[in-house]
């Protein structure tokens, strides 16, 4: 089974004449079929870690590998979805999805067929000819997911993809993401600062603090697998264990915040 790993990653940059560490000797990994969610406050280094996994940034030390092969730069085995969807506003939904396939050299008929297939997967088949400006926030994020899925990556890297959505749309997108995960068997790497989102979407949850980024806690979570096995969202979120873990994580964040304030 394909596995994406970050090994002993460190990154720093110059600030006012001094080196400031963002990541220091950080290691983690996930396999296809897993959902690794990184939970942490803003500014702790989560997005930097995702950018390194995606190949957008190069670490000062350490390496990113898939199955022992060191990666340099972006690649088709990793699809990326951002909070800012970065869609091409002058293209319609279908052409936004097909663009990445065109860059990879697929012929027009093949890329159009593939684009329509993934639009159907995310429930946008009826909006293929719509311009991006005519789509709602939730539809734009669905389109961002479709574009990432079109190139058939092994791993989806998602940087707070639902953070700008209203609460109801956000919950619907979380359910859609788990449906896609169940159907495709992709590995998910998602970063968030929402405790509820992390608990619902993760098979493995990493709590991060920083900078420099450090892993405070790692814990296996089974709510995503329970949803994939057919349990309802209402049943999962009303489970006392969900509430217990939610409160424990919130308490942990409060402890960290109070410790920082004391200093």
UniProtKB/Swiss-Prot annotation:
Binding site for ATP: 40-47
Catalytic reactions on record: taurine(out) + ATP + H2O = taurine(in) + ADP + phosphate + H(+)
Known EC number: 7.6.2.7
Protein name, as recorded: Taurine import ATP-binding protein TauB
Annotated ranges, domain ABC transporter: 4-235
SMART domains with a match to the protein in the record: AAA
Parts forming coiled coils: none
SUPFAM superfamilies on file: P-loop containing nucleoside triphosphate hydrolases (SSF52540)
Subunit structure: The complex is composed of two ATP-binding proteins (TauB), two transmembrane proteins (TauC) and a solute-binding protein (TauA).
Keywords: ATP-binding, Cell inner membrane, Cell membrane, Membrane, Nucleotide-binding, Translocase, Transport
EC class name: translocase
Native source species: Pseudomonas aeruginosa (strain UCBPP-PA14)
Locations listed in the record: Cell inner membrane
Molecular function in Gene Ontology: ABC-type taurine transporter transporter activity; ATP binding; ATP hydrolysis activity
Membrane-related topology note: Peripheral membrane protein
Recorded family membership: Belongs to the ABC transporter superfamily. Taurine importer (TC 3.A.1.17.1) family.
Function: Part of the ABC transporter complex TauABC involved in taurine import. Responsible for energy coupling to the transport system.
Pfam families documented for this protein: ABC_tran
Keyword Translocase: yes
Any one of the GO CC terms: plasma membrane
């Amino acid at each position: 089974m394909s596995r994406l790993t970050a090994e002993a990653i460190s990154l720093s940059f110059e600030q006012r004449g001094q080196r400031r560490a963002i990541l220091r000797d950080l290691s983690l990994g996930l396999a296809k079929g897993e959902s690794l969610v990184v939970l942490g406050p803003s500014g702790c280094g989560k997005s930097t870690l995702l950018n390194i996994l995606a190949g957008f940034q190069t670490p000062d030390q350490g390496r990113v590998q898939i199955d022992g092969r060191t990666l340099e730069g972006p690649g088709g085995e990793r699809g990326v979805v951002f909070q800012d969807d970065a869609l091409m506003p002058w293209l319609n939904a279908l052409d936004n999805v097909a663009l990445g396939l065109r860059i990879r050299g697929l012929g027009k008929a093949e890329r159009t067929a593939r684009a329509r297939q993934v639009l159907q997967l995310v429930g946008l088949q009826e909006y293929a000819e719509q311009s991006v400006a005519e789509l709602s926030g939730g539809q734009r994020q669905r389109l961002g997911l479709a574009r990432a899925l079109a190139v058939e990556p092994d791993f989806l890297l998602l940087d707070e993809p639902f953070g700008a959505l209203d609460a109801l749309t956000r919950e619907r997108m979380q359910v859609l993401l788990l449906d896609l995960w169940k159907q495709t068997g992709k590995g998910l790497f998602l970063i968030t600062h929402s405790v509820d989102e992390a608990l619902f979407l993760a098979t493995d949850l990493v709590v991060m603090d920083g900078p420099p980024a450090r892993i405070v806690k790692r814990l296996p979570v089974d709510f995503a697998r329970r949803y994939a096995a057919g349990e309802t969202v209402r049943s999962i979120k009303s489970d006392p264990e969900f509430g217990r873990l939610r409160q424990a994580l919130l308490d942990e964040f409060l402890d960290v915040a109070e410790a920082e304030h004391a200093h």
